[in-house]
Amino acid sequence: DALGASKAAAFDLSAGCTGFVYGLGVAADMIAGISSRRTRYGRNEGGIALVIGSETLSRITDWSDRATCVLFGDGAGAVVLRWNASEGGILATMLRSDGSGRDLLQLPAGGSEEPASHRTVAERRHYLRMRGREVFRFAVRAMPDGVMEVLERSSLEADEIDLLIPHQANQRILEAAGKALNLAPDKVYSNLEWYGNTSAASIPIALCEAADEGLIQHDDVVVCVGFGAGLTWGASAMRWSVPLPAEPRTAWRRGRYAALQSYAWVRSLVRRFVRWLFSRGVKEP
């Protein structure tokens, strides 16, 4: 609504800490399909998708549980995908799940299996619970396997990775994954010391910061990999095709974006007012 994207499809996709990789894969496939249909019918334009990873884990963190409360943070990050017929961009994505590990990382109550009640609240069952050792063993196996699968699909080798962007779970997991892939430490990006584990937001935040720091150059091979509750895991290999250096954010561009945002806000306000009038029995114009 605030963006003014009133004709765009919008939906939530939940896959725990792997959510951003899932969203990336789904969005890439959708805009590729939309763009191919447009090309077939003579419309020379590609699809565009905005993929957002966002989480507020502080709402479900038990601050009396020292095993989990020091790990998590809140955050949000986003990327824009644009269809392009040339080589590059997202090369391959893999998505997996294993429901047998659902109890390793979960919110015990509040869902359909155990609805909220006075008892569940009193027993503090609406907070995140994690079996850390089992999650660690799963992560250090699943992340390298996911990376190798997307590399194979992309006809690439591990030594061709310019930068690995893993889900920022904990430093030991990141180091173990990098070691399993024989990657130098400087090829495994980490910003854990600033934000902690921000779930689905961790990969887009890390990707954005790595690009801002100049760690990703045009035509670099970048692999994003994540794992999370479910259990879920996934990876996406891409060849960085964003033109660098990026277009500078001049005062005119900032003013233009601010004006567009203000226009979208006013339009939304008018539409809501019209709907309110209609609900009061006034005929819609």
List the predicted regions and their residue ranges.
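Claisen-condensing/thiolase-fold acyl-transfer catalytic domains that form or cleave C-C bonds
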Residues: 6, 13-37, 140, 144, ...
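Nucleotide donor/acceptor-binding cores
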Residues: 8, 45-48, 220
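Short beta-strand segments
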Residues: 14, 49-55, 72, 81-82, ...
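Flexible, glycine-rich active-site loops centered on histidine and acidic residues
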Residues: 28-36, 41-76
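Condensing-enzyme catalytic core mediating Claisen C-C bond formation in acyl metabolism
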Residues: 65-137, 141, 145, 239-285
